[in-house]
Amino acid sequence: MAIVPKRKTSKQRKHKRRTNDALPVQNLISCKNCSNMIQQHRVCEHCGFYKGKKVEGYKSLNLRAQ
């Protein structure tokens, strides 16, 4: 025979257990150079700029398409 729970799991206990299952909200900002939405502290994928400066050795999506 299988083991059965001694008591019914309450809704509150069930919901408390599920509090950490939500996906985190990404912090999006607009790029100062091209105004596209990007994640904070990342190089812009469209123009290759970070903090107003062009990043060396980074190929943006615009250059990859050509």
UniProtKB/Swiss-Prot annotation:
GO terms for cellular component: large ribosomal subunit. Residues 1-21 are annotated as: Disordered. One of its GO terms (biological process) is translation. Keywords: Ribonucleoprotein, Ribosomal protein. Pfam families: Ribosomal_L32p. Residues 1-18 have a biased composition (Basic residues). GO terms for molecular function: structural constituent of ribosome. NCBIfam families: rpmF_bact. Belongs to the bacterial ribosomal protein bL32 family. This is Large ribosomal subunit protein bL32.
